[in-house]
Structure formats: C-alpha cells, structure tokens
Amino acid sequence: MTNIIELPEVLANQIAAGEVVERPASVVKELVENAIDAKSSQITVEIEESGLKMIQVTDNGEGMSHEDLPLSLRRHATSKIKSQSDLFRIRTLGFRGEALPSVASISKITIKTATKEVTHGSLLIATGGEIETLEAISTPTGTKIKVENLFYNTPARLKYMKSLQAELAHIVDVVNRLSLAHPEVAFTLISDGRQLTQTSGTGDLRQAIAGIYGLNTTKKMLAISNADLDFEVSGYVSLPELTRANRNYMTILVNGRYIKNFLLNRAILDGYGSKLMVGRFPIVVIDIQIDPYLADVNVHPTKQEVRISKERELMALISTAISESLKEQDLIPDALENLAKSSTRHFSKPEQTQLPLQSRGLYYDPQKNDFFVKESAVSEKIPETDFYSGAVDNSIKVEKAELLPHSEEVIGPSSVKHASRPQNIFTETDHPNLDLKNRQKLSQMLTRLENEEKSVFPELDYFGQMHGTYLFAQGKDGLFIIDQHAAQERVKYEYYRDKIGEVDSSLQQLLVPYLFEFSGSDFINLQEKMALLNEVGIFLEVYGHNTFILREHPIWMKEEEIASGVYEMCDMLLLTNEVSIKTYRAELAIMMSCKRSIKANHSLDDYSARNLLLQLAQCQNPYNCPHGRPVLINFSKADMEKMFRRIQENHTSLRELGKY
C-alpha cells in the first residue's frame, strides 16, 4: 500500500492560495495584472466590505474565447509562456497560471468575457474551484471577473484579517502602485459606491503622480533620467524638503512591475546623500526598463522580489541620476513662495562663498513668552520681473491645468489654505537617536522624563555668546557655558508636555481653514485612527478626494505651527500605528520641542539670552534636554586657576616638576 498520493486539484489550488492570496488586496493585484496583460486601456475595480464580500474587476482588453475560459481555472494553464526560453524573457506581469485557480478555489467566482472576433461572449460560474455554469451570453469585448465570499471555505485565513479600513488601505496601495507602473491605463477604484482613485490614462507619469499624491506634492518633485547599455532609468523624486516618515512612498518599477529591493532603496538614499534628515525618506517613483534576460521574476509567488543581474551598476545609475538632478536645483527654501506661487526657483546654482557669522535678529516677546525672528532686509536687489512677471504666472497656470483632472473643482485661495508639510529644519547630527520607529529607546526616554524631580538652578549672570551657539554666564560656582538649542529645547518640551496634557474642549476657530492632502492609503488609515487625533484636540473632516479640512485648532498649538504640526502628528500616528494617548502626547512634545527650538548660528541679543536663562531656571529639569544631552557645563574657579596654573597641587613649583 502506497503512502504517497497525488492531491486533488482543488486541494492543490487551496494550498497555492495560501501563498498567492494573502488578503483581498492580493486578489485585486492578480486580477488587475491579468487585465493589464490583456492590453486593457481602462480598468475599473469595485469592492464591497474591503473586498471580503465582493471584488469586481472590469477591463476592455482582449478577452478570452469560449474554449479558453474553463482552462483559465486549471492550474499552470497560461497563454503567457509556451517554452523554457520564455521563462527567462518574461514580458508580462503574470506567467505561472496559478492566480485565477487559487482565487477560484477559496471563493465564488463569476467571469464574463468576450473577444472582438466573435459575436457573443461567455459566462463561467465556479464555487470552490468547481465549475457550475459555462454558457454563451451577450457581453462587450473584454473581461469582467467578480469574486464573492472570499475565504468562505478557509475560515482560518479570515481570523488573520485586519480591520476593514486596514484591508481597504492595502487595496488602495496596490491600485496606486499599478497606476504608477502603467500611466497609460485609466484606473478607477470604487469602494462601497464611493470613488477612491481615478487616473486619466494619458501615459504621463507626472499626471499619474498628481492624481495619487496630490498636486502640491507633484510640484515639488524633480524629473530624473539616466541610461547605459543595459538599463534605462527615469521617473520623479521629491526635493529634500519633502519627505515622509517611512519608505512606503518609495516606488521602484522594473518593466512595469512594482518590486521591493533593499539595495535599490539604498541607492536612492545614497543619491540624496546628506540632504535628508535622519529617519526621513523621500517620495520617489523610479521606472527601470531592462532586458528581461537580466531580471529573474520567478523568485516568489507574489513576484515582488526580483533578482537583477548587474545590480551594482544599476545602483550607481540611480544614485547618479538623483544626485545630478538635485545639483541643478536651488535647494534653499524660497521665502517668496507664497507671493510668487512657485515652489522652486529654477536658477543655475551659484558658486558658494563662505560668509562670516552674522546676527539672525532673534528676539524675545515677553507677552507671548516666546522667541521670534525679525525679518532682515535683503542686501542685494533682485529685479522684480524675475518673480512677478506675467510669464511666471502664466506658466504656473498652465502647469496646474495640465496636472489637475478636468472634473476637479479648483478651490479659490481666499476660502482655504493648502497646508504644506514641514521642511527639514534640523540635521541628522542634532539628535541621531530620535527615531520614532525605535520603540525601546523611546520608552526608556519617556520613563526617564516622567521620573524627573524638580532641580535647583544656579543664579546666572549672562555676559556673552560664542559662534551663535553657546551662551556664557557666571555664577557663584564659576563659569557656565550653555547650549542655546538644548536649553530652549528643554523649555519648549516642558511647555508642550504641559499644554498637550491639558487638552480639552478649548479650541480656536480658524478664520481661513486649512486643507491637508494625503495619499489614498494614508487617508483611509487616518480615518480609522481619527479618534486618537481627536484626543489631542485635532479634528479633521473629510473634504474631497484624499483631503481633510481643519476648521479649528487646539489652543496649545500656535497658529503658525498648524500646518507642520498637524502633518507631524499624522505622520507619527501612521508610523507608530498602535500608540497610547500618553505615549503619543509625550512623543509629540519631544518632537515639537526639537523642531521649534533655535538652532546653532543664531545670535541672540542680550535681552533674549537673559530671558532664555530665566525660562530655563523655571524648568523641572534644566540640566538636560529631553534626549539626555547636557544643557550646560560648569568650570569652577578652582578649575580655571588650575588650567592657568595659578595653583598647583601640594604647592609644587613648576621647576620641581621639571618644566623649567
């Protein structure tokens, strides 16, 4: 009696489904990729209950014949490869013939299809992989596949599904990646009757990016291009000032296929070099065209892992393309951006000259109990026509018209403000240990901060500053040197910690509301976690496509910090995912105190410096910044006398010590 048996085909398909169909988003990916392979120009994805109840993909592609339709549910039956040589030169997204049989084995599937060569189409209905109906019907050219009751016969898989909003976010992400990979295809995603994504299918990658990430984001992205004998690299990368808290916005495409590759991600970051702050990542869409012989996609069932020959050469090509593109830009933030309505000045980069330290005009306002920067006059006259000419305005209007969908309503600038994300206002050397993804370090830091006791601060008399960074003061214990950034960071941390801890119903109405734009998946995730934002006094309302509107702000948040502060909180919420209100508030206080504090090379006037020391003296722990760095150091009178050899231990003379 033999112990080895051949498994039934349906059971084999269900086993394969364990690898191919991880969640509803996997079904959407496989069906849409099949539609793209069928040379479709329009693809519509409709889902109900995040795909668990129903997924329907409709395309206008080539369709299937009546004879081929039942074969599509047979395992390893495909029209995309026919010989071993085809396996090493794959030009389609699918090729194994596993996806459709795997999906059919764990759901009820209905397929309507027709080719342009025949006058009628075909209908197939199967449940659990078993064909129940196969008949001729009237249907337009193309294919419509409906998947219902997903995982109905594999209840164990249902237990591992996340919330409906989380599963929907995965589906949106899949459709967005495929839209970027194939801008020539018009994609539409509809969830429970609500349209979430729509692209025009014009073939313009920049327009596809605008449809997914928003117009404001697209305006701050640069085109890149590079090529050698084996690779062609093109796409768009964001300016260093436009970053996100994770790598989810870095999209790498190889021959129209979205892939995950650690080394290529590393090459992208290398192209930016030191222009990115630590823990921040750019928005990138890079399209790589390569000879299929140099890429092996037959590595993983999801086909997202691809082995690439000459990978090091490709890395160098990507890094060079990004670095060269950034070199051509003036990366200094434009102070006249709001007036000129232009995000970047496209000037040739001038030769850099070392300038002496000069005062930045930082002053203290005793009424607001805060510092402010006094605007300084521009020393060099800039021709007014460079910024305000009609040519500039006209070009910007044309750019907006090209990127905005025709159906989108343009909101007047007087009714709302479009919030911009925070720029990189401190470098990676400021706080290399500040990384919200390192939960253990953050937890230890928060525990230490909670256990701080009130300290007694010495009475100091300020008398000077060095290099716009260190303050000098004297006290009865000698000379004190204070790090002005660390000092104000401690002051601001305790301010934000107390104010955020006092969150209640005290809100300030905004005369002009703010609009906040997000990607589709982030928009859905934030809707699910909105209660956490409400806890800290942030109430965002849905306002159009992937956009929230803020009509009021908490009183602890200064009005000039609304745009950057709300984006920072949303990024933190998306990154940490499961976070307690207590930890959320503490992390926010640490982050905002660091970003809102004065930096090095800011010269303070005497009044501002003295008030900073007064504020520091009132802190619970004035000796360390929230990250543990010392705020001040002390040289006692005895230390000074020893350094100048005014006193010697045991009164030993210099001659006795052999110095003379």
Curated annotation (Swiss-Prot):
SUPFAM superfamilies: ATPase domain of HSP90 chaperone/DNA topoisomerase II/histidine kinase, DNA mismatch repair protein MutL, Ribosomal protein S5 domain 2-like. Keywords: DNA damage, DNA repair. One of its GO terms (molecular function) is ATP-dependent DNA damage sensor activity. GO terms for cellular component: mismatch repair complex. InterPro entries: DNA_mismatch_repair_CS (IPR014762), DNA_mismatch_repair_MutL (IPR020667), DNA_mismatch_S5_2-like (IPR013507), HATPase_C_sf (IPR036890), MutL/Mlh/PMS (IPR002099), MutL/Mlh/Pms-like (IPR038973), MutL_C (IPR014790), MutL_C_dimsub (IPR042120). It holds the Pfam family MutL_C. It comes from the Bacteria. SMART domains: DNA_mis_repair, MutL_C. GO terms for biological process: mismatch repair. This protein is involved in the repair of mismatches in DNA. It is required for dam-dependent methyl-directed DNA mismatch repair. May act as a 'molecular matchmaker', a protein that promotes the formation of a stable complex between two or more DNA-binding proteins in an ATP-dependent manner without itself being part of a final effector complex. Belongs to the DNA mismatch repair MutL/HexB family. HAMAP family: DNA_mis_repair. This is DNA mismatch repair protein MutL. The gene is mutL.
